[in-house]
Amino acid sequence: RLSFPKYHLPEYDFFEVAQDFDFVNNSAWLLTKQVFTYSSNTKKRKASGITSVTFKDYELNKKFDKKYFGPEMSAASRDAYLRDSAFWASVRTEPLREKEVKLIHYTDSVRAVINSKAYKDSVDDVTNKANWKNILYKGQTLSYHERGTRYMLPSVASTIAFSFGGFRTQLPFIFYKIDSLKRTISLNTNVSYGYLNRDINGSVQLTRRYNAFNQGTFNISFTRDFVAIFSGDAWINQLKRSNYYLDNAIGSGWSREVINGLFVKANFSMSLRRSLAGYKTYGIVDSAFQRVLQEPTGNAPSFEPYNALYGDVEISYTPFQPYIREPLEKIILESKWPTFYAQWRKGIPRLLGSDVNFDYNELGIRQHVRMGLVGNAQYTIKTGSFLNTKDVRLVDYKWQRRGDPILFMNPNEAFQSMDSTFAVFKRFYEGHYFHEFNGAILNKIPLFKKIGLREVAGGGFLI
């Protein structure tokens, strides 16, 4: 019998494991029963449970084919979730307690109500009912469960935007649909009007997941908007006028899992890039930003209009990727192996009037590792370089971002202590490590677990 210390449990207040062993076939002491007892107390609810597992019919010294234990951890057929209580009574290794029987009857009743048409209709009625909170700042959702559709309409607050060139009125809209085979389609649109320059911007993106098992997905997008030269830059640089240009773009993408663990993504896009040097801005806003930044915000960069056609391909592979097979989808689990990936981005010259001409490639590995009581870790190691730089525009540079002042960044994505943003053209080697201790340190201090503080650490290198 083993009980874990409370301060080592991020999700529970009590967790105990009891094990029974028996001398099987006069050959070996083996586990025959395992009981997990656990409970959790929070401000909102109290929960407790017991899970019993029985082991029997051992076959000792059995020889298995090398491919017998594959990456598929379990599989469920379509009728698995339709089994009644008689079936479970026949396969359950020990009888249920009276309290457990009552709980099952209660949950079965609740599930029957939740899955009934009348209940789903009532949920739709509540969701679709307009009220002042939805109208003013939350936004209005319209749900129709029989069709599997949802519409998300903007609130009054969300129609007000401030962007390059001043205040704008925008109308965002989202449509989402899922069918009985868990195939989905979503439409995300936004149209905005700028008062100072009397211009119209907007975007439309259509995404279709046509296969839920191999994650087969394609998308099409149209965009006219103000875009940052380096969208991943520090927030303090995002305030500068000199970081923006006007992008008129059309793009398409496709991705799917080819074999277990092997994913392929491909994207093509065409951009008609234009300078914002002639756009009007609010002088009072520029002055305010200059005081905050303690340096000139600069003007939008002036450049000759040009077109750019791109092709992107990424191949990623996770060896021995474990998964669960559900009736309509595949659930990917964390692997003990890292994910290896390769990216190639091509600036395609001449075709459709494109002016860019470059090749950039990147290789790397990434992984999320569960380390038991010590916590969880994430790391990324990558290297990249331009193989061809015949015509690389400012927007296409490979940037290393500066650290954010005041705010801390994710150590797995950037370098906190870097004092400036700069471009790299030669091969670089970059690594990041991020560790979340899950209370391994703070939970040992009385009352700290209830506060909800998190301890994290990380670091990186760039060569």
What are these regions (language model features)?
Residues 76-463:
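Exposed, low-structure sequence patches enriched in small/polar residues
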